[in-house]
Regions:
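N-terminal active-site segment of His-dependent metallophosphoesterases
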Residues: 29-35, 40-41, 52-54, 70-163
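Aromatic (tryptophan-biased) beta-strands that constitute blades/sheets of beta-rich domains
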Residues: 346-365, 390, 400-406, 440-451, ...
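Extended active-site neighborhood of metal-dependent phosphoesterases/phosphodiesterases
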Residues: 80-96, 161-249, 271-285, 295-334
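N-terminal export signals
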Residues: 5-25
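Short, acidic Ser/Thr/Gly-rich low-complexity loop/linker segments typical of extracellular
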Residues: 54-68
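Short loop/turn segments that connect beta-strands within beta-propeller blades
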Residues: 395-398, 436-438, 481-483, 524-527, ...
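Metal-dependent phosphoesterase/phosphodiesterase active-site architecture
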Residues: 29-41, 93-95, 118-121, 239-243, ...
Length: 703
């Protein structure tokens, strides 16, 4: 049958799947049917799954199939088996079509036991002008021998979807490209999903690769209402899973979990629409790969992995670096992954004159090293599922590892040292207090947080009272550092917005915190009582850690420096800052300046009296964007600057260097260029600057 030519040449292919089970029995041929054949080199192939979006059958020994016509059928499509690909894996369902012919071609990359694929999510582009990053995707796919590329939705708008279709398809990428329907992909038309389906085909489908069955599900709701219901999708999923051999690994793709609570640790089942699926009865469920939250996240529950990736071209809403993730599935469907931040290029790592350097197994994101009594403590991230999350203690003089203890998930942000204990929090809210001598756990705190609301913020502490503050913006908890007992909990009434990677400001009896798309909150540090909250267009986009001093809050949000009255939350002064300030920095007050990092203007100093820009501290081009929604090129300092004993300003930077500037005029004095981006603050102790980078290197620079 005829189809629009540009769709025929540019449509994404499905690549795929499984060792075919025995073909189904010959379907009844009375009445009206969707009929057709599946061929390989003009020869019939048996056992291929064919569906109309509800009913599923397999081709017979002659490669033929027949599905009873039904009202509401949109497409006739196939589940492309392992070892094959198909340029036209679907056709619009029509009673006028006499025969649907699907032609498979061999695809060795998906023919083995297990496979690799590149996962993308939330690229949110506006047109062809924003496709330059896709070359990096192809490079990663080629290097990792990916069987396919999957984009789990929020391609964004008609122009964005069309640009993806033209620039990222099976021809340009050299392998099948799979697209999922996200909430921002539902655009104006007869139904929210109409445009997506005209460009990419069925919003729900399956395919196979490496002996694994992959199931694609759509977003339940979006910017425009879809015509389908998730109950319809659930009925098809049940029929689809009934076609595969028992024990065959199954991995789901979707823009988000099919049900809000699906990524809990309970693996007895999940829900699509109003219909429950019991893992042990319906399939060998080994993974759900999704997007939507703009975060890097890997959680394993038994044999099942839940994987979320940050956008590939910009920082996530919670300051996750732009990410290209390769997922590897073994023959049993077990998923592991490798992350590259923002680019396919290999970083050129250099020691840069460091007194010592030690590489840790995991990456270091926003976890600032803590130096105490001759020991450097660093927390590591594991968004790849490799088991590298933990806390490591190193000898400050030599860099030798003193002890290393695992955490259940990533230690993405700041730790604290209070009451003789090192205290860390992972992104699922678990808090652990380690004894500095040997890393033994003194106490634990394990909250039950909502599975979508992972914690990206750093821990804060009040050394005077011995309280440690965990949580972010809502459901904050104050814990006694000595005993681990909870002193107070926020009531959790404000469950809005998204997490951000700041650290709460503590001082003068108050604790000030923020949430993206929500606002700023001030609690009584002793009781947890909410003193005030402010939600406005500026404070809805935080990122930086607030500084409390002399009854004022010095805050940075969106594009502004804010001076706020601590008692009332009212803004006293505001200054628009060139380059944007939605980064994980904090204001450094000096005698004449307020100094802080920016997204695009390096380090900026404001005159304390006038708030005029006094100087800008230059840095190189950033290596990986992480500030929310920010894209390259940029000159980003996303860390907290500090004053050296000689009065110079020091900060680590996204350009892969630790920089030093003259405080009076911002003149660049020197740098240690090591090659990997710095998201964590550098610190000074006993004549050395200590810094930890995104490649997991910890270094000591003698200054």
């Amino acid at each position: 049958m005829k189809r629009r030519e540009f769709l025929k040449s540019a449509v994404t292919c499905a690549a795929f799947a499984a060792t075919a089970a025995a073909p189904c029995a010959e379907p009844k041929t009375s009445g009206r049917f969707f009929r057709g054949r599946v061929l390989v080199n003009n020869r019939p192939i048996a056992g291929v799954i064919v569906t109309d979006g509800l009913v599923c059958v397999r081709t017979d020994a002659k490669g033929t199939f027949a599905i009873p016509e039904r009202k509401g059928a949109r497409f006739v499509s196939i589940t492309v088996p392992s070892g094959y690909q198909c340029a036209d894996f679907y056709y619009p369902a029509s009673s006028a079509t006499k025969s649907y012919v699907f032609r498979l071609s061999p695809w060795k990359t998906s023919a083995g036991k297990g496979c690799s694929f590149v996962h993308l999510a939330d690229s949110e582009i506006g047109g062809m002008y924003a496709t330059e990053w896709m070359e990096n995707v192809k490079c990663v796919a080629d290097e990792d021998d990916a069987a396919f590329i999957v984009h789990t939705g929020d391609i964004c708008s008609y122009r964005g979807m069309r640009a993806h279709l033209l620039a990222m398809n099976s021809h340009t990428m050299g392998r099948p490209v799979i697209y999922c329907l996200g909430n921002h992909d539902m655009v104006a038309g007869p139904a929210g999903e109409t445009c997506f389906e005209q460009l990419f085909g069925p919003a729900w489908r399956s395919f196979e690769a490496g002996g694994i069955h992959f199931v694609v599900t759509p977003m339940p709701l979006g910017d425009h209402k879809p015509s389908y219901t998730m109950d319809e999708v659930a009925d098809w999923v049940r029929n689809d899973l009934a076609m595969i051999p028992k024990g065959m690994p199954v991995v789901f793709f979707g823009h988000m979990m099919t049900n809000w609570n699906d990524c809990s640790m309970e693996t007895s089942g999940f829900t699509i629409g109003r219909k429950h699926f019991n893992f042990s009865k319906v399939c060998n469920f080994t993974g759900f790969v999704y997007g939507h939250t703009h975060q890097n996240y890997f959680r394993r529950s038994g044999k099942t992995a839940f994987i979320c990736s940050s956008p590939p071209r910009m920082g996530g809403i919670g300051h996750a670096p732009a990410t290209l993730r390769t997922v590897r599935a073994d023959a049993k469907g077990r998923l592991d992954s490798t992350i590259r931040y923002g680019t396919s290029a290999k970083l050129k790592i250099a020691r840069a004159g460091a007194k010592w350097e030690t590489q840790l197994p995991g990456k270091v994101l926003f976890c600032t090293p803590i130096v105490k009594d001759g020991i450097v403590y660093v927390g590591t991230s594991d968004d790849e599922g490799c088991g590298n999350a933990g806390v490591t203690a190193l000898d400050a003089a030599s860099g030798k590892i003193v002890w290393s203890k695992p955490m259940e998930n990533s230690v993405n942000n700041k730790m604290v040292f209070v009451k003789g204990l090192l205290i860390a929090q992972d992104i699922e809210g678990r808090v652990r207090a380690f004894r500095p001598s040997d890393g033994a756990v003194a106490w634990k705190y394990d909250p039950r947080i909502h599975p979508w609301q992972i914690l990206l913020n750093g821990l804060a502490a009040d050394p005077a009272s011995g309280l440690v503050f965990a949580g972010n913006g809502h459901r904050m908890v104050a814990i006694d550092a000595s005993s681990g007992k909870v002193v107070w909990k926020d009531d959790g009434a404000r469950v809005r917005g998204e997490p951000c990677a700041d650290t709460a400001g503590v001082g003068e009896g108050c604790i000030v915190s923020s949430r993206n798309w929500d606002g700023m909150f001030c609690n009584d540090a002793r009781t947890g009582k909410l003193l005030w909250s402010v939600i406005d267009q500026t404070r809805r986009f935080p990122g930086a850690t607030p500084l409390i001093a002399d009854g004022r809050i010095h805050a940075l949000a969106a594009t502004s420096y804010l001076e706020i009255d601590l008692k009332s939350g009212k803004t006293i002064r505001e200054k628009k800052v060139p380059g944007g300030v939605q980064v994980t920095t904090r204001v450094l007050p000096t005698e004449k300046h307020f100094i802080f990092g920016t997204v695009k203007s390096g380090l900026v100093a404001l005159d304390r009296k006038t708030l005029d820009v006094a100087w800008k501290g230059a840095v190189g081009e950033a290596l990986a964007p992480f500030a929310a929604y920010s894209k390259l090129p940029q000159r980003c300092v996303g860390t907290i600057p500090f004053l050296m004993p000689d009065g110079t300003v020091c900060a680590s930077s996204n350009d892969g260097a630790v920089h030093f500037w003259r405080e009076s005029d911002g003149k660049h004095l020197k740098e240690f260029r090591t090659g990997a981006p710095y998201f964590a603050d550098a610190v000074f102790d006993d004549g050395c600057v200590f810094a930890a980078d995104a490649a997991g290197y910890v270094r000591a620079f003698k200054v």
